[in-house]
Amino acid sequence: WEASGHVSGFSDPLVECEKCKKRFRADQLDGAKKCPECGGGFGEVRQFNMMFATHVGAAEDEASVSYLRPETAGGIFVNFKNIVDSFHPKLPFGVAQIGKAFRNEIAPRDFIFRSREFEQMEVEYFVRETDWKRAFGEWKDGMNAFIGAVGIDAASVHELEVPDEERAHYSRRTVDFEFDYPFGRKELYGLAYRTDFDLSAHAKASGVEL
């Protein structure tokens, strides 16, 4: 997680009410200057890393620090060489998986929509760098088609082009598909072009060409 940039960059902006001490994600307050719970003022915005840290083994020192995975994609990248050496796939190809992920959310809410432990499905699709725009468009169209195929009302789904300053540290372009939930418009799923960031970072950290 250090190599992937999650230790230093997987964070959300946090503010704390100076009166009731409740904490909120600053980017979800819609510009509010007062606490929605008690009307108190907020302290300074600070970055809050969402990874759960723990220690492996009997000693609690820096060498034993470990993290619960905040996304499932990391396992695909660190096993990329094994996949290529075993199956010899030709570009483009994809790897899909489902599994548990854990995030130390600032404010879990809305039943199971935002929780600290959840099941996540991800697909990593590998293409040549010169072909990413075409592939991105195809996946975006396919994700829209999937929405209709499973019976979701297309009028309730909206595409959000995530601006540069709000994208994840690994992404060159991100489109979020947002759904009109009873509690507001929130992300349903997303599409991101991660470039070769992950493979290059893990290759550099491990000294193994992926």
Regions found by a protein language model. Name each.
Residues 1-210:
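TRNA-recognition modules of translation machinery and tRNA-sensing kinases, especially anticodon-binding
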